[in-house]
């Protein structure tokens, strides 16, 4: 069995999805069982301290159990790898073929694993794992059914504005992207800063709908 004890301490929901999928893909390729920690997280990610304050306490703070059915995951898959077991690092932001093909058993892997090469052989199963729970997907489907040929526009601002490792894209980027779509399309704007979006002239016309839920789960769904 291999695990990912640091799940939830290395990024938000998107990162956690890559990490889970890679863990499962590596385990399947090697013929192992896999496990992720049970999570104590309540609500959605709002502050990085929710993650990092739990490091070293034996508490997990990942989000995967909240929005997704994880229908191929059972109780055996919800546990920590023993703390005295080796930690195997990804090593870089590129595909680690050696780790994929030669990962030892009874270790916890660690990294970002941001490539589908780790899990493309179990693509359909991963898609099933990441099916949203009905309480999230049902209202989203109802809303989108009322919009003819919608286009989703996602704008991340809050943490990117102050993070020196990232940058918030300017309005000219979105304006250029929108030119590739039919001007009659309805644009649904999802953002962690909906108030800012509502203030922008670019999104003022009737073809734009700014989602007010401010929920990462609803926005992704």
Positions of predicted regions on the chain:
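Short amphipathic alpha-helical segments and their helix-coil junctions
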Residues: 1-7, 135-140, 205-206
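Donor-binding and catalytic core of enzymes assembling or modifying cell-surface/extracellular glycoconjugates
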Residues: 13, 181-221
């Amino acid at each position: 069995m291999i695990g990912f004890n640091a799940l939830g301490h290395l990024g938000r929901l998107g990162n956690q999805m890559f990490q889970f999928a890679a863990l499962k893909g590596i385990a399947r390729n090697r013929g192992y069982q896999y496990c992720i920690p049970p999570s104590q997280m309540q609500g959605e990610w709002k502050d990085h301290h929710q993650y990092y304050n739990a490091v070293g306490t034996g508490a997990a703070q990942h989000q995967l159990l909240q929005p997704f059915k994880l229908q191929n995951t059972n109780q055996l898959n919800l546990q920590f790898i023993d703390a005295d077991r080796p930690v195997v690092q990804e090593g870089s932001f590129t595909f680690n073929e050696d780790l994929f093909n030669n990962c030892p058993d009874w270790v916890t892997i660690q990294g970002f694993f941001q490539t589908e090469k780790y899990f493309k052989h179990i693509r359909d199963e991963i898609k099933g794992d990441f099916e949203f729970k009905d309480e999230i997907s049902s209202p989203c489907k109802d809303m989108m059914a009322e919009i003819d040929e919608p286009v989703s526009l996602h704008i991340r601002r809050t943490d990117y504005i102050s993070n020196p490792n990232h940058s918030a894209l300017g309005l000219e980027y979105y304006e250029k992207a929108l030119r590739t779509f039919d001007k009659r399309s309805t644009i649904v704007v999802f953002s962690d800063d909906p108030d800012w979006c509502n203030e922008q002239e670019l999104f003022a016309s009737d073809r734009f709908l700014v989602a007010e839920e401010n929920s990462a789960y609803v926005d992704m769904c």
